[in-house]
UniProtKB/Swiss-Prot annotation:
Bilayer disposition of the protein: Multi-pass membrane protein
A GO biological process held by the record: ERAD pathway
Keyword Endoplasmic reticulum appears in the UniProt entry: yes
Keywords, sorted A to Z: Endoplasmic reticulum, Membrane, Transmembrane, Transmembrane helix
Subcellular location: Endoplasmic reticulum membrane
SUPFAM superfamilies, per the entry: Rhomboid-like
Protein name: Uncharacterized derlin-like protein C365.08c
Domain of life: Eukaryota
GO MF annotations, alphabetized: signal recognition particle binding
Cross-referenced Pfam families: DER1 (PF04511)
Record field: transmembrane: 32-52, 60-80, 100-120, 130-150, 162-182
GO cellular component entries: endoplasmic reticulum; endoplasmic reticulum membrane; Hrd1p ubiquitin ligase complex
Family from the record: Belongs to the derlin family.
Amino acid sequence: MASEFSGQIQELLSRIPPVTRYILLGTAATTILTLCQLLSPSMLVLHYPLVVRQKQWYRLFTNYLYAGTGFDFIMNIYFFYQYSTYLENFVFARNAKKYIIYLVKVALLIDAFSLISGLGSALNQSLAAAIAYNWSLFNSFSKIQFLFGFHVQGKYLPYVLLGFSFLTGGLPSLVVLGFGIISAMIVNFFDSIHTPVVHRSNSPKLNSQKVSGTFIGKGKKLGT
């Protein structure tokens, strides 16, 4: 029984492209260590004095590995898996090097916005919003069933996420989520990432998807 379950897990992981897989595993491991009180979120999150004065540069990246706990964590992991898998497989054609470079650029821009504004210190949701924004560009005609059962086209997903973020977390939450979308726009412009027709979701394979509002969380301000 145990070996069969282990085999199913390995098969599931093997279907996930490498960059997405390792980010998901890193996020899951971080959450487990946090829940077991073996690791404090304050050791991971973005904090200006520690980054600049004490040169703890690792925080520029480790803050993305903390996605909260409970149901929010599960939903954030699910949506990151969905959208990042699509981007890595189809937009970046499973080119791990190019996808890593792209994510690093977006992450550093989000960090810069956060450090300048003083908003947000665990920015996993901002990165997920950036990925969701890119997914929406390539699936602009895909129908998405959002919370409470209303449907939106894929191209409106970023705006729906921003609106729901404002309703649940106020202006700070909206701004933190907006960091991700704006960062993706900037990187896309300079990297000349376009949306070829072949990837637009006229395809019947890209059917209605359900999106939960728990993807939006308040910008976490931890360890400060």
